[in-house]
Amino acid sequence: MGHSFYSCDWGTSNFRLRLVHLPSLEVTSELRTADGIDRLEGDDPGRFASYLVDRINELPGSEDQASEIPLWVSGMASSSIGWRELDYARLPFPLDGSGAIVAALGALTESRPCPVRLVSGLRSEDDVLRGEETEALGLLKLLGRTEEETLLILPGTHSKHLQAREGEISSLRTFMTGELYAILTQHSILRHTVEEPETLAGLEDAFVEGVRSGARDGLSGGLFAARTRQVLGGKEPRENGAYLSGLLLSAELEPAGNCGSDIFVAAAGVVGDMYRRAATELGIERLETVDERNLELSVPAGHALLEKNFQGEAS
């Protein structure tokens, strides 16, 4: 028999809430805000629950749901700046979700008594993540990659590389690609010469030059060229932005060329284009980008897997 649940992805700077129906995994409504965890200031421990109740009440269709349907929350809500700090689950991490640390927080409020299930993050001996564990569980399930050796790349401010094999995530590694781009273009001398491109159209040569520079000279050795390309070569800021993107992606992707796995990148649009083009230039043949539908369903699918396991059913 089908039932519904709320899927909440609550990051540092963004909030996303969806009403999901099982077993179809149909998202019947959703709501997004820029109210990340770090924006809910104050010492009142009830502020997180109050915020969630307000958002659930705004969610189309929520008034038709039973008041006790589960609410799954992942992301920074389980961090030291969040709702309740939870320890990280450890590698190896089973892809059926059975290794996840889930805290049952009880009813959200008296007026909205949804049972709250807070999901912790994941750690290795020297790296951590929060939120991406749920996304990875969902994506690998949707892609049918729960047994095959797979390198899953989750781009972002901090790009996460998760190695999966034989039904578990065995390693993780973080690349600060997005944050480095932001720092370099906003706070370094390169801010005067670089503009972020919205597309690779007409900029592929500059992007490829950046990828090749990274492979040849290394990241540090290729950075200043983003300035000299304009000062000496008269290149436009968008071209330099494409060059810098290629340089940074070269540094991120080059180690992946030796992993021996099929590689899946959770990105569409210009970001997906950049990963594919950089991989081609670096001779990485077994890289695919994830389609938009699976990207959209990744977190709800991860929560659905955890919900199934939480109820004690076979995964």
Please describe what each predicted stretch is.
Residues 65-79, 156, 249, 260-269:
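Short glycine-rich phosphate-binding loop at a beta-alpha junction
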Residues 38-40, 121-214:
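Glycine-rich phosphate-binding loop plus the immediately following alpha-helix
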Residues 61-107, 112-129:
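Short beta-strand-loop/turn "lid" adjacent to the catalytic site in phosphate-handling enzymes
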Residues 14, 261-278, 296:
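Glycine-rich phosphate-binding loops at beta-strand->alpha-helix junctions
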Residues 212-255:
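Adenine-nucleotide phosphate-binding core of ATP-dependent small-molecule kinases
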Residues 5-47, 289, 293:
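Short glycine-rich, Thr/Ser-proximal phosphate-binding strand/loop in the N-terminal lobe
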Residues 289-315:
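Glycine-rich phosphate-binding/hydrolytic loop that grips phosphoryl groups
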Residues 29-68, 78-81, 85, 190-193, ...:
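N-terminal phosphate-binding loop and adjacent alpha-helix
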